[in-house]
Amino acid sequence: MQENKMGTMPIDKLIISMSLPIMISMLVQALYNIVDSIFVAQISENALTAVSMAFPIQNLMIAVGVGTAVGVNALLARSLGERDFDKVNKIAENAVFLVLLSYLLFLIIGLFFAEPFFRSQTDIEEIVLYGKQYLTVCCCLSFGCFTQLMFERMLQATGKTVYTMITQTTGAVINIILDPILIFGLFGFPKMGITGAAAATVIGQMIAAVLAVVINQTRNKEIQLSLKGFRPDGTIIGQIYAIGVPSIVMQAIGSVMNYGMNRILISFSSTATAVFGVYFKLQSFVFMPAFGLNNGVIPVMAYNYGAGSRERVVKTLRHTVTYAVCIMAVGLLIFQLFPTQLLKMFSASDTMLSLGVPALRIISLSFILVGFGISCSSIFQALGKAVYSMFVSIARQLVALLPVAYFLAQFGNVNLIWWAFPIAELISIIMTIIFMFRIFRTIVNKIGEKEMV
């Protein structure tokens, strides 16, 4: 079989070839999120607030899907590096089984828990109604989301990230096209309002999922997927989640943080909650390229770890840190210089502008530190120590961010709450550096020693 490029191509070119397609596709995804909220904001500010409040559940959905897929991705890449192709195929088969389990979980959430979730955050009936309509569709038809995420990670694990760009971009473009059509009832379609926004999302996910499955079956020759006579393998599932659970927890913690921040901000006004939701949409346009870089280098590091190439692992990390910090620096400049223009895209009222401009400027001060943290998480995950990333995430969002935000809220000035973000990031970076020293001492510096003996 032909040598995999992850073990031979120069690192700088390899990172670009692996990460750039993912970064582009994730940028398109982020653009969709922004466009989606721009259209929803034209319904009403309460509709925008409802979508903002739905984010914790949507983020939890992504956490389960991406976390499981990250485990599959890293395990596939490591097994490919070890040239254990029988295990590669078994991992892929169990991955499909886990997609089904993930969907069933969120089907239950959509059917029974959408309305109680919104009532736990607000007593404004219009927001509850909008939120229930939106979230029920997103959860009950989420099978496309989980299928897309899993099969895209299979492509990434074998270095075929350009196909991931095709599937993600296709889904996002379909979302963007369908949003105004279904929300406002254009071209003879019924006017569905906020339900139309949700419908556009799931339709895009389903089409992208079908495309990802077809590409895997026709182009991904390193993985031979066949479910004939399949039985779940507890050992492989355990190995997948040994890597994936910390990633799931990390992103799920984001849901807890977001829910907690919504509760804190709604005590000031629904506009403050809408501002926070808009910030998350905007920051995704900065964070997604960094996460795309992260997703691209995880299989590179995992492959070279499995192949015993310490030099390539270290060089990949060094390049990743440099690229991620540069990406976040650009985001910092945009948020500092153009906050008013960014907010006006969402039909921002004068009240929203008065709250949103300082929010964007204060929170974005943490972006450089975030870039370094995202880079370090890639080596934690690739080397099977994703639990380190989980500890850092818990410290940042639960131990630091929410308590500090709650404390600052007691002063009665909503603008003080935004300072909780840079404070929490400082704490998390200290932990990240400690874990980096540990992982180099215990794992990285010992890579390849067996081959030298």
For the regions a protein language model found, what residue spans apply to each?
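Structural signal for membrane-spanning alpha-helices in multi-pass inner-membrane proteins
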Residues: 110, 153, 179, 183, ...
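Short alpha-helical transmembrane segments in multi-pass integral membrane proteins
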Residues: 1-19, 76-143, 190-245, 301-366, ...
